[in-house]
Swiss-Prot record:
InterPro entries: Aim3. Residues 236-273, 413-422, 432-441 have a biased composition (Pro residues). It comes from the Eukaryota. This is Altered inheritance of mitochondria protein 3. Residues 275-285, 295-314, 358-368, 497-514, 521-531, 555-568 have a biased composition (Polar residues). It holds the Pfam family AIM3. Belongs to the AIM3 family. GO terms for biological process: barbed-end actin filament capping. Residues 45-56, 342-354 have a biased composition (Basic and acidic residues). The lineage of its organism: Eukaryota, Fungi, Dikarya, Ascomycota, Saccharomycotina. Keywords: Membrane, Phosphoprotein.
Length: 590
């Protein structure tokens, strides 16, 4: 090894140096590129984070600024007391009753407004053209409007701020297109006429679509100029100040109401209320120096006079504590209650148990009856058998007998146990009808006839059928002169009157023979040799010992000799007869 190191020392060191230099340069390059890439990524992420933060801040600023710009928009939560009452389904006459009042003030307007409504409602050119036409007629009434409408400003002085003007002027310009009349606000006399004209026209136009679409329900809407209209105009502006800044959206609400005609006519009143709120706002900006102030009570009273239903309704207060109804249990005096029933009889109180025995027996009879005893049941069975087999006249007595038997057994038997709650009670057998009569058969009729002739015969034993044949006649006693023939018979007769059956039979046979011999009957003559019957032909015995043509052997030929039967196994004999051997295929004789 030492020689190898000494020989290759230079080449090894030079190779290691080269590899180290190359590796160092590679690691430097990788480190530089990685550092640059990480730096770029970190910078990009930092910029993205900054942009996101700036965007979020901008959004927050916009959200913060939106309430200032849109401060005049109303809140979405509105007091429900300002809405008109809904139509009643149960009493539709109330919906029609309110329509008859404004009809008297309407006839003057449709003649003026009908040609105006023929034009599209949303045309911009229709509004300025209508201003000069309608200005002269409602001028005196509009003057009243101007005089009566300024009071709201002192109540909410915050409406005179600039954002409220800008927020209100923009919707007025876009929705109603009234820039030229607004320029006339510089003149105080025209300021009274023009805003009222501008506000009056949209209200009239909101009336007309309701007239044509709803025709009748549109009439409950506040009427156009009349002696009562100024009062209604005064009544309607106050609600918006109570509920908040609600003056800017009226133009939008006025145009959104006509599309839903299918709803009830009571939903038409809100748009005119919002439309009447326009003149106070326009006059707040220009008629700021007018400070005629009225107490707040004067604004509340017209609202109450407008409709009594609004004053009676109260908004639901979520913070109010819930009224809980407490159920009071009635106290019962336990001393006045009767004692509980005993375990033996749950259906009756214990007082009834102390009553007389007659009442108790009646109660037991009406309820469940105890099972009869064995003796009474046997008597009942025998009586039923005898009564059913004798005559039908005994049937009524049979029906009355179980009741007497049951009454006798009840007097000795203790009161019955009550039935279990899950099992039905026992049924009184005496309440059942009597069993049906059995159909008379020939055997029963014959038996009844025999019993009628001989009443001494008892009833048929239980479990036996009445025989169809009458009983045999009694055997006559044997005469004493014939007793010498048989010693046994004389001994038996001498010993007593009762003779055994064998001797009686033999005596009867002898008597019959003697009587037949006396009459010379042909049945008693002994056969002679000439009249003997021919002998019986013996049966041929087919055995193989006989000479002649052998007959085919029988299957049971092996069973003929008794010796073979004892020696041969029966199973082997069965095999020989059932399954022949090889040399006995054709049943040849052995």
């Amino acid at each position: 090894m030492s020689d190898f190191w000494e020989k290759n020392k230079g080449s090894i060191t030079s190779g290691l140096k080269k590899t180290g230099k190359v590796g160092l340069s590679g690691t430097k390059y990788v480190a530089k590129t990685g550092y640059q890439a990480g730096k770029k990524n970190w910078g990009g992420n930092k910029k993205d984070k900054q942009n996101k933060k700036q965007g979020e801040e901008d959004v927050d600023d916009e959200l913060d600024e939106e309430p200032a710009h849109h401060a005049s928009y109303p809140p979405r939560v509105v007091d429900p007391s300002y809405f008109p009452p809904p139509p009643s389904r149960t009493n539709p006459s109330q919906n029609v009753a309110g329509e008859h009042m404004p009809r008297q003030t309407y006839p003057a307007q449709p003649s003026i407004q009908q040609p105006v409504y023929q034009q599209p409602v949303y045309q911009q050119s229709a509004y300025p053209a209508q201003v000069p036409q309608q200005a002269p007629q409602p001028a005196p009434q509009q003057a009243q409007y101007v005089i009566q409408q300024p009071p709201p400003p002192p109540r909410n002085p915050g409406y005179q701020q600039l954002p409220s003007q800008q927020a209100y002027e923009e919707p007025a310009q876009y929705s109603y297109q009234q820039p030229p009349p607004q320029s006339g606000f510089q003149q105080p006399p025209q300021a009274g006429y023009q805003p009222t004209q501008q506000t009056y026209q949209p209200t009239q136009q909101t009336y007309q679509p309701t007239q044509q679409t709803y025709q009748r329900p549109a009439q409950p809407v506040p009427p156009p100029p009349s002696n009562q209209s100024p009062q209604q105009v005064i009544q309607q502006p106050p609600p918006p100040p109570r509920s908040g800044y609600q003056q800017s959206p009226p133009p939008q609400v006025g145009y959104q109401q006509p599309p839903p005609p299918p709803r009830a006519g009571y939903q038409q009143s809100p748009p005119p209320q919002f439309d009447y709120q326009q003149p106070p706002v326009q006059q707040h900006a220009h008629s700021g120096p007018l400070p005629p102030s009225r107490p707040s009570d004067q604004y509340l009273t017209p609202i109450q006079t407008q409709s009594t239903v609004h004053s009676q309704t109260r908004p639901y207060d979520l913070t109010a504590p819930h009224v809980k109804q407490r159920l009071e249990m009635q106290s019962v005096d336990l001393t006045n209650l009767p004692p509980p029933p005993t375990h033996r009889d749950r259906s009756s109180p214990p007082k009834s148990r102390e009553s007389s025995p007659a009442g108790q027996s009646q109660k037991v009879h009406s309820g469940s009856t105890p099972p009869p005893t064995y003796e009474s049941s046997q008597k009942d069975i025998e009586s039923s058998m005898s009564s059913s087999s004798v005559t039908p006249s005994t049937q009524p007595a049979l029906a009355s007998r179980p009741s007497s038997i049951s009454s006798q057994s009840r007097s000795n038997v203790p009161p019955p146990m009550p039935p279990k709650p899950n099992e039905p009670g026992m049924v009184d057998v005496s309440s059942f009808p009597p069993p049906p009569r059995p159909r008379p058969t020939p055997s029963m009729e014959r038996e009844t006839a025999l019993k009628a002739q001989d009443p001494s015969t008892g009833p048929t034993p239980r479990g036996r059928l009445a025989g169809s044949k009458p009983p045999p006649p009694p055997v006559k006693p044997k005469p004493r002169n014939l007793a010498a023939g048989s010693g046994s018979g004389s001994g038996s007769l001498g010993s007593g009157n009762h003779t055994p059956l064998a001797s009686v039979d033999s005596i009867s046979q002898e008597l019959s023979k003697v009587q037949l011999k006396k009459t010379n009957s042909k049945y008693t003559q002994e056969p002679t040799s000439s009249k003997l019957p021919p002998p019986a032909v013996p049966r041929k015995n087919f055995t193989p010992d006989k000479q002649g043509t052998p007959l085919p052997p029988n299957k049971n030929a092996s069973l003929k000799s008794p010796t073979d039967q004892q020696d041969v196994n029966p199973f082997e004999r069965y095999l020989k007869s059932a399954v022949p051997a090889e040399n006995d295929r054709l049943h040849k004789p052995m």
